Amino acid sequence: MASVSTRSPVDDAIRTESGVELFALSRELPVLLVFLRHFGCSFCRKAISDVTELAPELARRNIRPVFVHLGTPEIAQAHFDYYGIPDVERIHDPEAHIYRMPIFDLGREHPARALINLKVLWGWFIRGDIFRYGISRISTDGHQMPGIFFLRDGKVVRSFRHRNISDQPNYLKLIG
C-alpha cells in the first residue's frame, strides 16, 4: 500500500536562511510571515519595527515571526540587528520567486506611483513614517509589494496583501 503524503511541493521549496522548512516550522508553532519590499523603504522598516514591538505578544502566543526579503543576508542582518531582533528567522528571496508563488501571490506596482498616492504621502508625512524610519535608495526590486500571512499547521490561515506600500496591517487581528 502506497503512503499518501500530506506535504505540498511548496513545503520543500521554502527554507529559512538557517535551513528550516517554512511550512514544517508552521507545524511546530504558528508563523507570522512578513514579506518586505526593499530595505530602503520607510514602510519596510516600519514593518520590522512593528513586529519587534509585538515580540512579547507573539512569544506569549507561541507565534514565531519569519521575514521574507529581497536583499542580501548581510544587509538584512544589519537591519534586524538595528531593530533588536538579530536572531529572527529570515528567508532570502532575491528573485522574488516566493512572493509570486500562487499561495502568496503578492502584487507589483511601479515605485513612481507611490509618489502620487495620497495614502502613501499621508503615511510618510502626516503619520511621520519618513521621519521615524527614514528612506534611502531602492537597491532591490522596488516594484514588489509586501504582504503578511499567518501560517498554522502547514497552511495559510489569514493574509494581508498590501494595496499600497503604506497600508497598516492589524497584526493582532491577523494572528487572532
Predicted ranges, named:
Residues 1-24, 46:
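N-terminal "domain-start" segment that seeds a small globular fold
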Residues 17, 27-28, 60, 143:
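A generic fold-level signal
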Residues 17-21, 51-54, 78, 135-136:
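A generic local structural motif
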Residues 22-51, 64:
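Short active-site neighborhood of thiol/selenol oxidoreductases, capturing the structured segment around
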Residues 36, 69, 152:
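Short beta-strand/turn micro-motifs composed of small residues
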Residues 47-100:
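Structural microenvironment flanking redox-active thiols in thiol-disulfide oxidoreductases
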Residues 89-166:
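Thiol/selenol-based redox catalytic cores and closely related redox-interacting motifs
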Residues 166-176:
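A short, polar/charged loop-to-alpha-helix boundary motif
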